[in-house]
């Protein structure tokens, strides 16, 4: 009974796209400059945590630690007060890359479950690297995005 309720909550949460959690708006309604400005301001930690919570893979792989570069314990300690914790612009850009990638992979593979499966296992196009492991680097993010584009358009080498 509890699992069914939890799944229903997750389904309701997943109705929002990952980038919508961070931007607090539909990214299609924002100009690229506005997205840049919001990222430069820094996303709120709570919004990043909410975005990560919709993904079993992102939760299991401790993506928040990858984004902020701090241990889970340090993050918890900093988040305890009543103050709003904001990520730096660099951390926010990395969070946005993870959100964008999950959206793109979901679009390409049709479901978030299939997208997460692909993101979490070695990829031949990435010379055996796991897509999730290379996303926090801007060049790695672009390589994974290019790979998804090739899959989407049926271009394999």
Regions found by a protein language model. Name each.
Residues 1-157:
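Non-transmembrane "mature" sequence context
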